[in-house]
Amino acid sequence: MIWRRRAGAELSSLMALWEWIVLSLHCWVLAVAAVSDQHATSPFDWLLSDKGPFHRSQEYTDFVDRSRQGFSTRYKIYREFGRWKVNNLAVERRNFLGSPLPLAPEFFRNIRLLGRRPTLQQITENLIKKYGTHFLLSATLGGEESLTIFVDKRKLSKRSEGSETSTNSSSVTLETLHQLAASYFIDRDSTLRRLHHIQIASTAIKVTETRTGPLGCSNYDNLDSVSSVLVQSPENKIQLQGLQVLLPDYLQERFVQAALSYIACNSEGEFICKDNDCWCHCGPKFPECNCPSMDIQAMEENLLRITETWKAYNSDFEDSDEFKFFMKRLPMNYFLNTSTIMHLWTMDSNFQRRYEQLENSMKQLFLKAHRIVHKLFSLSKRCHKQPLISLPRQRTSTYWLTRIQSFLYCNENGLLGSFSEETHSCTCPNDQVVCTAFLPCTVGDASACLTCAPDNRTRCGTCNTGYMLSQGLCKPEVAESTDHYIGFETDLQDLEMKYLLQKTDRRIEVHAIFISNDMRLNSWFDPSWRKRMLLTLKSNKYKSSLVHMILGLSLQICLTKNSTLEPVLAVYVNPFGGSHSESWFMPVSESSFPDWERTKLDLPLQCYNWTLTLGNKWKTFFETVHIYLRSRIKANGPNSNESIYYEPLEFIDPSRNLGYMKINNIQVFGYSMHFDPEAIRDLILQLDYPYTQGSQDSALLQLLEIRDRVNKLSPPGQRRLDLFSCLLRHRLKLSTSEVVRIQSALQAFNAKLPNTVDYDTTKLCS
């Protein structure tokens, strides 16, 4: 393409050489840009992947080739020459004077031969293949001279490390390359000689020297003295215009369509755009015209290289000093689960930094892989055969924790297996078992070992609280029988007990002492005021080796004839003492608690048996039963089926005689159980003076068993009563501080036991 400067250009000489004005195929991209207003740019990406001046430029091609070869860094030093802009004077004169373009006769003849309705193939053969798709409007002359050094930093660093042990003179560092690049324009020959020597001796760098521009750079001292130059280098800044503007109106649209089909489809199909998507409608001879096989193959090769790099990164991490040092510091005297390894991991700052470095490298690698995969899918979406894409999975910290376990426990006889914490076993290569090492014992809480045995790491040496060592394993401790301390059960079955209670059999009667200052048995008394009575056993004085269980209560109450009085009973039970303040109230007829059963006796007087049956369901400890008797007056209500009760003092006529009442007898039904206070005191002494650690734990377990069984017999309520403290205070005569100390020791020991739930109790005894 021949050009003159604007001052001395001749139009005739430019038009005579019109073939030089129409550019070749690599300038087609601006023709596509001319119709970009009606089509989106993104659908063209797959068509423009390997065409156009940018992708065909030498600098871009060199960069892509070096990147595929593994060179990660580029250093470039360059200098530019003066820039001059030249214009197409023929087009400029047409725009200014409005005169027609003096086109070459051959060009006119080819247009006439096309006719009014040419096919796309005719336009391609007669115009596009001869004259191209664009002509040049303007260009910038000049050029640059540059030196480019591509560097593989990994190979360079390894070479530098290896050279440190040999000679310092042969080492190549980034600083050396910087100095050589800076001296290129000062002493070009010696610099290139040194760089080429390094390139031959090492594969860590690639050196490229370029001198671009239509002037041949330093061949011209002054552009004013140049008569004409040839503009044909794709590196220059050029302004193009589509050839269709030179054609008649009836040919312009068909020319654009033919040009797009020629450039985008290589004349193998017709270029079509629809619904923001463009593709080639392939001809019968080229069914794969939409499938850029070379690009797809290059991307598949890139993915393979990424997989190899991924393996290299992981291998470098395992071979790093930080990884090896971390493995050496891991304790070997007990089994390490993933949680323990993770805790040790967080304590090693050097290992953490090395893993973060691996993570960052992997993120960059996978981002690159995802971009390639996305582009690969876009390129192959119209291929008949889809590419096979296989990428390795990202290795999370969980993978590395399991990997570390595999190095510890599945790395015998030169074979590395895979460890599973769930099954506590190894999976060895080729289904062998020779890679499995002896697993040390598991140290932890509950049934895990406290320490491993020093002579055999696979077995427990000591156990946690509440567990005992048995054949190298820790098993839950079971409290020994507490029957020789205190009894809880009777030999009678439930049905037998129920029958004896119904019959008020004297064989289950507990003989208690009746005490009352308000009345006497078998004596009539005025029931207008509340009467208090109690039945007590005085076990500390008479029956110190027994505790007692109440199953029922029976009273025989008689009234004078025609009396309208109704007895009302309130019962309080003290489990191990005698005072009323440490007694609990029986919730008679509340919720599911039993009610009094009244049975009339065949006697001349109004006598009734009042019986309260607790049975095995509601049985509880008792030492003293407090009974409070008061009376109420029964009267008919407004309706005949209703009864109204009055307090005696509320009656209209206080002077009226309401009758008398007497209690013939009171019986307590239940049974007595064995109780050894001295043995329990000895058990408590072991908390302060244990013979061995095992004896103290055994004593605590037995006391816990006694405490829970005693408190389980507390009366119904939202919270259990603390009957065990009452037992310690009244039957063992312990001080309040001693009781608090024992309860605290039991609570602390119970918290260490497995699968135990402590419960809150209500204080009963002070």
UniProtKB/Swiss-Prot annotation:
It comes from Mus musculus (Mouse). This is BMP/retinoic acid-inducible neural-specific protein 3. Residues 74-264 form the MACPF domain. Induction: Up-regulated upon differentiation into neuronal cells in the presence of retinoic acid and BDNF. Down-regulated upon differentiation into astroglial cells. Down-regulated in gonadotrope cells by bone morphogenetic protein and retinoic acid. Glycans are attached at N168, N337, N456, N562, N609, N641. Belongs to the BRINP family. The gene is Brinp3. Keywords: Cell cycle, Glycoprotein, Growth arrest, Mitochondrion, Secreted, Signal. Expressed in the brain. Weakly expressed in embryonic stem (ES) cells. Expressed in ES-derived neural stem cells (NSCs) and neuronal cells. GO terms for biological process: cellular response to retinoic acid; central nervous system neuron differentiation; exploration behavior; multicellular organism growth; negative regulation of mitotic cell cycle; nervous system development; positive regulation of neuron differentiation; social behavior.
